[in-house]
Amino acid sequence: MDHAARIGLEVIITDHHECGHSQLPRAVAVIDCKQDGDPYPNKDLAGVGVALKLACACEGDSGKVLEQYADLVAVGTVADVMPLVGENRSLVRRGLKKLGTSPRPGIAAMMRESSIDASKLTASTIGFSLAPRLNAAGRLGQAETAAELLMTTDPRAATELAVALCELNRQRQNIETEIWHEANAQLSGTVPDAPIVLASDRWHQGVIGIAASRLAEQYSLPAIMICLNGDTGKGSCRSFGGFNLFEALNACSEHLMGFGGHALAAGLNIKLDKLNDFRAALARYYRANKPAALPEVQCDLLINDPALLSIDNVRALDRLEPYGNANPRPMMCVCGVSLEALSEVGSGRHLRMRIRLRSEHFEAIFFSHTAKELGLREGGLVDLAFTPQINEFRGRVSVQLVVCAARRHDGRELCKGILENRQDMLWAAAEFCPDRADFVRVWRMIQHQDFSAGDTAEAVLAQCPEGMEPERFCICLAVFLETGLLSSPGGSVYGAREAHIEGKADLESTEIIRLLRTC
């Protein structure tokens, strides 16, 4: 900027990052609503949003400018993961409408090459399909390719540029995977307890940010990856769990050549001989300021009836678009469902699942995760947090679950519900409906010992026969209680003992078995 001033070049700077505490660059104007004292109410504009405001001010006709550039503002706002609330939400909604009806040639070509139906474009489509392809060019040092795509009016040139960007994105994915594997090798299988700070002279500067995001999610910690060049390095930083990266870097700035960004993502420059000091200082700051607890997945609805996931119901959720950061799609969950099939897709980067909920089957996809790291296996039970979406493939329309979190099912809560006669939980126990052999085995156990079910779920489960699922054992006890084979003063399995009734009990006619058979 000093050189620009010396040669008489007038420069206007637009930005949306934190300004820090250093002196602002010498320019005709610095436009950033995060400057101290700036009165503009929306502090979460994307960089493209700030540029739009400048264009509106220069043109004097905001409506005209927005009509011309709403599509680019939408793409940039979603790509930069800005909160989709308030003004940002309105801007993206306006841009999606333009993208769906009259996209510029470059974006239209990109949507064709990405197999995106423009009439069904959503903010999520931008975030997961369009934005990565556009960003790939800049990450690999060819930003002009993306710029040309967005500016061209020639449909043929647009197609050629879109093909080139898709190829660059494939290269970016391969480089990212290599970096991620190398980063894990540096960690040597250890589980760090402070922000991850890794460095290498083998990594690609434009891709380390994506790898850092993946590491942050994998280890539930902030991650910083530094690309070394001689005795200096440039790093990309990604937060996790609400930890404010910008404030952390500011607190450790004595070890840095410079830094910038915001709470969730930042960049830095560092001398190689300061790396260890910086890592130690950041660890100390993290331990003193780390979030009180890791963020939990907050689900809006527990699905226990597959009819809730009908195509019509899922399509109705689209009326609330655009979804995104700070305005996510409704999160739903299923618990204790059968995991019928597992397969890796996308060269092993993603996990496809087929689950069974009562009598219905659903396909699910979990991006950037594997069955091994999650500890999942076919035939097991799983809890999933997900957003439902419509999937159309070869003329077939179905509901697909886009998984946000997965874990092996812990049957203790289900067992507790069965023992306490909570019929609202029986749907999740259909997999464990006992057969005659199960009933015989449990009854013989009861008869051959002075059986008492115990006063807690833990005491009951401690008596489960070896090799039998705890849920199946609990159902057997609940059925025996319903038929009178067991008696209990409190009406639940807790404290139940053998009742010594005369005659045979019809186990299959019990309400519990009837409900389980219909699940």
Enumerate the language-model features and the residues they cover.
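Glycine-centered tight-turn and secondary-structure capping sites
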Residues: M1-D2, V48, G206-I210
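N-terminal small/polar loop signature for handling phosphorylated ligands or for N-terminal nucleophile
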Residues: M1-L24, V30-D32, E178-Q186, A216
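Alpha-helical scaffold elements adjacent to nucleotide-binding pockets in ATP/GTP-utilizing enzyme cores
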Residues: H3, V50-L54, L91-R94, D277, ...
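Hydrophobic helix-and-loop "lid/oligomerization" segment in the mid-to-C-terminal part
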Residues: I7, E59-D277, V345
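Generic detector of well-ordered alpha-helical packing
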Residues: H16-H17, C33, V81, A136
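Short gly/pro/ser/thr-enriched loop/turn and capping motifs at secondary-structure boundaries
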Residues: H17-S22, A29, G37-P39, G230-G233, ...
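Short alpha-helices
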Residues: L24-V78
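Mid-to-C-terminal polyanion-binding domains and interfaces
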Residues: A157-L161, L168-A199, A251-C519
